[in-house]
Regions:
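Membrane-helix entry/capping segments
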Residues: 256-292, 314, 359-390
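Membrane-proximal extracellular/periplasmic loop immediately following the first transmembrane helix
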Residues: 25-117, 121-122, 369, 373, ...
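Transmembrane alpha-helical interface segments in multi-pass membrane proteins
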Residues: 317-363, 387-390, 394, 398
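"Rare, low-scoring activations can occur
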Residues: 158, 166, 191-286
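Hydrophobic alpha-helical transmembrane segments of multi-pass inner-membrane transport and secretion
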Residues: 4-31, 281-317, 344-354, 394-401
Length: 425
């Protein structure tokens, strides 16, 4: 009877531990899966070059350099000098904060099939200078075969040119190719109609977010728009290092003193990404969740191990007797492990039933909107099955760890005393 009650309590404890561990494993499954998805672009060895404009009150300000012809000429000189810097593999320019990858700025537009505006998709908008190689700087690739992309691959001479991504093609045109097709913003009836010149891989806004659709439009900045342009360079790994920034500033501070422009700031994309993650709470949220999940996981581990250690300890007499009659320790350990696994198997069906209720009431975070193809976390039966398999394996390992050490220390048996007759004579 006592053994039966003990088994019931162990099953109840395993049931609770299974449900808690399932929630923990599910979170990490989705988080790790999202981070493992391709970003669609890269930031390695990329630097952002920010140019400042002298105010009219500055003693170095020259009014003649502020007219439109001088501004356009200075803009071209800035691009040429960045391209010609030793070790620069590619240079790109884009307009405004929203065209700067991995920042807090966002400019969203809608794209729809010009022939059927009911088929539409929301995308991130980027305005790039087609005379620079913005797409190569950030290692964009073709959706069809994954080849690296260069901005010069597309016909930007067409004022209606636009380059989109795989998600736009799939959502707006289905299985058909989007290249050569017309798209427009369904929310802007008077807006222009664009012609798709190419389809790239979808891109992530943040590392832990899902890939999104994007649209790249050409901008040929006017004199008024030039001060808002941002510049990006990708450098050769051979020249990358802790001294690159100091060397660049030392050499280019004079070279980039063009007209009323000056070198304002040079920032690595590693720093930009880290600052963005911190300002948006991504770093803090991830660390807090990791700490809470680690604490919860440690408690589950200690709870289950403690229960089985206590269970084995209460049977030390039985274990010692079996060892005394010749049972090897490996056989005893195997029996204890089998008992633990059997108890886990008994708790599993009820745990699955409870978890299914949580899923049905919407307890899980299920992604919405347009998702990548074959996105596992959105396939609930598959996600439910995989997470529970991982949870079961995790608890099985914990049980094996819990039952393994105790049989190595059987109780000491006291030597029996000899009985004899006492001579009272």
């Amino acid at each position: 009877m006592n053994r039966w009650r003990s088994n019931v309590w162990v099953c109840v404890e395993l049931l609770l531990a299974f449900c808690l561990a399932w929630y923990m494993v599910d979170y990490f499954f989705v988080e790790i899966y999202n981070r493992s998805l391709p970003s669609g672009r890269g930031y390695a060895n990329v630097w952002q070059v920010e140019m400042g404009l002298l105010p009219e009150t500055s003693p170095d300000y020259r009014a003649a350099e502020s007219d439109s012809i001088a501004m356009l000429g200075n803009y071209e000189r800035i691009k040429d000098r960045l391209r010609d810097y030793p070790g620069v593999q590619a240079m790109g320019a884009a307009s405004g904060c929203y065209s700067t990858p991995y920042t807090g700025c966002y400019y969203g537009i809608g794209l729809a099939n010009a022939a059927d505006t009911s088929k539409r998709e929301a995308v991130m908008r980027y305005e790039i200078d087609p005379t620079t190689d913005f797409l190569s700087v950030f290692n964009h690739s073709y959706a069809k075969d994954g080849r690296p992309v260069s901005t010069s691959d597309f016909d930007w001479g067409d004022p209606r040119a636009i380059v989109t991504t795989r998600m736009v093609e799939r959502k707006v045109f289905g299985e058909a190719s989007a290249v050569g097709r017309e798209v427009k913003d369904p929310f802007d009836e008077e807006g222009p109609t664009y012609i798709v010149k190419g389809v790239l891989e979808d891109i992530k806004r943040f590392d832990n977010s899902l890939p999104q659709g994007a649209a790249f439009l050409a901008i040929r900045p006017s004199a008024e728009e030039i001060p808002e342009m941002n510049y990006f360079i990708r450098i050769d790994p051979a020249v990358a290092g802790p001294r690159f920034a100091d060397t660049f500033r030392e050499k280019m501070s004079r070279e980039l003193r063009v007209g009323n422009f000056y070198l304002k700031r040079l920032t690595s994309y590693e720093r930009i990404k880290a600052d963005t993650d911190y300002s948006f709470g991504i770093t803090y949220d991830y660390r807090v969740r990791m700490a809470l999940m680690a604490f919860l996981g440690l408690n589950i581990l200690l709870c289950v191990m403690g229960t089985f250690w206590y269970r084995v300890r209460m049977r030390r007499g039985e274990i010692g007797l079996r060892m005394a009659i010749g049972s090897p320790r490996e056989e005893i350990r195997s029996q204890m492990a089998r008992e633990g696994i059997c108890l886990l198997l008994m708790a599993t069906p009820l745990a699955l039933l409870i978890e299914a209720q949580f899923v049905m009431v919407g307890f899980l975070d299920i992604p919405k909107g347009t998702l990548p193809e074959h996105y596992w976390p959105a396939i609930l039966p598959l996600r439910f099955l995989l997470v529970n398999i991982l949870t079961w394996i995790l608890l099985a390992i914990v049980i094996l760890l819990a039952v393994w050490p105790p049989p190595a220390r059987p109780p000491r048996w006291s030597r029996p005393r000899r009985c004899g007759m006492t001579d009272n004579r």
